[in-house]
Amino acid sequence: MGLHFKWPLGAPMLAAIYAMSVVLKMLPALGMACPPKCRCEKLLFYCDSQGFHSVPNATDKGSLGLSLRHNHITALERDQFASFSQLTWLHLDHNQISTVKEDAFQGLYKLKELILSSNKIFYLPNTTFTQLINLQNLDLSFNQLSSLHPELFYGLRKLQTLHLRSNSLRTIPVRLFWDCRSLEFLDLSTNRLRSLARNGFAGLIKLRELHLEHNQLTKINFAHFLRLSSLHTLFLQWNKISNLTCGMDWTWSTLEKLDLTGNEIKAIDLTVFETMPNLKILLMDNNKLNSLDSKILNSLKSLTTVGLSGNLWECSPRVCALASWLGSFQGRWEHSILCHSPDHTQGEDILDAVHGFQLCWNLSTTVTAMATTYRDPTTEYTKISSSSYHVGDKEIPTTAGIAVTTEEHFPEPDNAIFTQRVITGTMALLFSFFFIIFIVFISRKCCPPTLRRIRQCSMIQNHRQLRSQTRLHMSNMSDQGPYNEYEPTHEGPFIIINGYGQCKCQQLPYKECEV
């Protein structure tokens, strides 16, 4: 029994399907007309630096990317990009945009990246980004924004990076970032922020990096960062911060890097770093610190890198706690930590000053000395004022009114430095000795023919000198009369012994012996 297959579609239906397929193939080609002055690659339009004063009309509603960088666009009107509903990225940086109307980006539901940096935007309506529900990267840096509406970023739940650098922001509205639950990077640097609201960063549960450098902040209470439970890096350099406090007892276990360079910090709360048990990098260069309490230093247990240069370190017994901590610190510091006062220690490394001027009795124990020394010009002696010092948790008072008469104070040479110099010199001599041996060995290996010729010439010269000496000796011996005189008394040969030994001679008529 055979099987018979019958095509269920007739000829008219097949023709209709074929025509539809042809039309579908032609649609992309019909919509791919490139805007004038633009460069198009598939569905990406590049219209950079072409002198546009407004957004060109869409010629392809299916375009995925549009770049209008470095043009002369001054305003973004309402529904300006309604015909670009498929855009995934839009670059409008380096224009002259000053006005952005409400719903200017309406219809861009698929947009993931929006760049508006380097314009003249001074105000943004609260509904500007409402419909950008898939936006991940927003750049508003280098504009003229002085304030932000509290609901400006509402609905941006997929936003991951937000750049607000180099504007004129003075405050951060409460709950401004409440809906930005996916934000990981926030840059608020180079603004005019003077203070931080307590709930200014509420909602940023995934934020890992926060930039607040180059502002006008004067006080920092780390309790304001309580909601930043994932923060890894905090930049606070080049502000006007003079005091660091922490108004709450909590643990900030995620923070690993804190940069406070270039501020005016004079005092630090004793417990401020106890909230950061995993802090690895602490930079406090170029501040106004003159000492650090041992409790602050002992709380930095996970630190691997520290920056403390450019401060007003007072190299007196008050610096002993810092010197002891630096001596046992296993990590590295970025720059040299130098004394600022008193004058005779200015410019000296702290550790060198402590050893050279014997500022601390024992660096193996954490000592915070509160005693101060000063010079009395009338009596010419050094006086130690009554005070106390701390060894561990015990306070030990010093004796008041102790006076030590002296005319001049010269620091004794440091034995450790002397020993180090001796070791260094010995090592240098040993190195020179082995270097010379090495050069000789290389010369013998690399130049044997030359050495052989030198040796042969030396042997020939020695041989010639030996022959000359032998001839001279023979001449001297001949001058002394080597033959003995004799009187012939008989005929025939006889034996005569002279200076050259025994020889047999023949008697001759004259008094000589012929060998």
UniProtKB/Swiss-Prot annotation:
LRR repeats lie at residues 63-83, 86-107, 110-131, 134-155, 158-179, 182-203, 206-227, 230-251, 254-275, 278-299. It comes from Mus musculus (Mouse). It is found in: Cell membrane; Postsynaptic cell membrane. Glycans are attached at residues 57, 126, 243, 362. Belongs to the LRRTM family. Disulfide bonds: none annotated. A motif (Involved in DLG4-binding) lies at residues 512-515. This is Leucine-rich repeat transmembrane neuronal protein 2.
